[in-house]
Amino acid sequence: MDDKLVIAGREYGSRLLVGTGKYKDFEQTAAALDVSGTEIVTAAIRRVNLGQNANEPNLLDFLPKNRYNLLPNTAGCYSAEDAIRTLRLARELLDDHRFVKLEVLGDPNNLYPNVRETLKAAEVLVAEGFDVLVYTSDDPIVARELEQIGCCAIMPLASLIGSGMGILNPWNLQLIIEQSKVPVIVDAGVGTASDAAIAMELGCDGVLMNTAIAAARDPVRMAHAMKLAVEAGRAAYLAGRMPKRFYSAVPSSPSEGVISSVKS
């Protein structure tokens, strides 16, 4: 089945995007990415060495260049200015790489997005030619404004970053999905495989996760589980679920031609 995720004009066979933080080491990171089947790998410029620290292990040494599209992100930024500066640095480090994830946080205790600063940063970055995938709240009005600015993917949270609480407001996600003409990728809050499957069944174009895999007892096995969940959820969405019924059950077996126990 030819069902590709398309972001900024590039096609991807996998709809699972995976982060690189919180793993035991880069070897475990690489193993989890491998079994996840992901093609888009995100890394926090402020926390992961991508070449800015010459004396430390470099994540890029563990990632095959021809397999993954790197998605530098601005995790840890609390203002538009910080986020813009961070992604300009990423562009320098990565030879004019412009495929980026914008996130501007509002509170260090809950990591909820600051949508005002996010909108400000998005305007500048899009004007500078970046392909911006943007982390935001599940507010459909904000999502529409980010799309109008020119962001190439909208990434609403399912619940708070790192919470593992799953999808708390499927109705808002549905509104964003229905109005958007760019991919909608759930970002933050996924805790286990069923959360990923539900996101895909709702009609999301993809799911991004990090802690759900890295904080599992067996991250590599969980990465494989997430691969299967995203694929199953997408297939179920395309297949179309049966309608829900209340007190009007229809038997799965036909009633015609059955053997009757009534004596004539």
UniProtKB/Swiss-Prot annotation:
GO molecular function annotation: thiazole synthase activity
GO terms (BP aspect): thiamine diphosphate biosynthetic process
SUPFAM superfamilies, A to Z: ThiG-like
Enzyme class: transferase
Annotated residues for binding of 1-deoxy-D-xylulose 5-phosphate: G162, A188, G189, N210, T211
Active site: K101 (schiff-base intermediate with dxp)
Pathway the protein takes part in: Cofactor biosynthesis; thiamine diphosphate biosynthesis
Protein keywords: Cytoplasm, Schiff base, Thiamine biosynthesis, Transferase
GO cellular component labels: cytoplasm
EC assignment: 2.8.1.10
Pfam families (alphabetical): ThiG
InterPro entries: Aldolase_TIM, Thiazole_synthase_ThiG, ThiG
Catalyzed reactions per annotation: [ThiS sulfur-carrier protein]-C-terminal-Gly-aminoethanethioate + 2-iminoacetate + 1-deoxy-D-xylulose 5-phosphate = [ThiS sulfur-carrier protein]-C-terminal Gly-Gly + 2-[(2R,5Z)-2-carboxy-4-methylthiazol-5(2H)-ylidene]ethyl phosphate + 2 H2O + H(+)
Its job: Catalyzes the rearrangement of 1-deoxy-D-xylulose 5-phosphate (DXP) to produce the thiazole phosphate moiety of thiamine. Sulfur is provided by the thiocarboxylate moiety of the carrier protein ThiS. In vitro, sulfur can be provided by H(2)S.
Subunit note: Homotetramer. Forms heterodimers with either ThiH or ThiS.
Family: Belongs to the ThiG family.
PANTHER family xref list: THIAZOLE SYNTHASE
HAMAP family assigned to the protein according to its UniProt record, in alphabetical order: ThiG
Protein name: Thiazole synthase
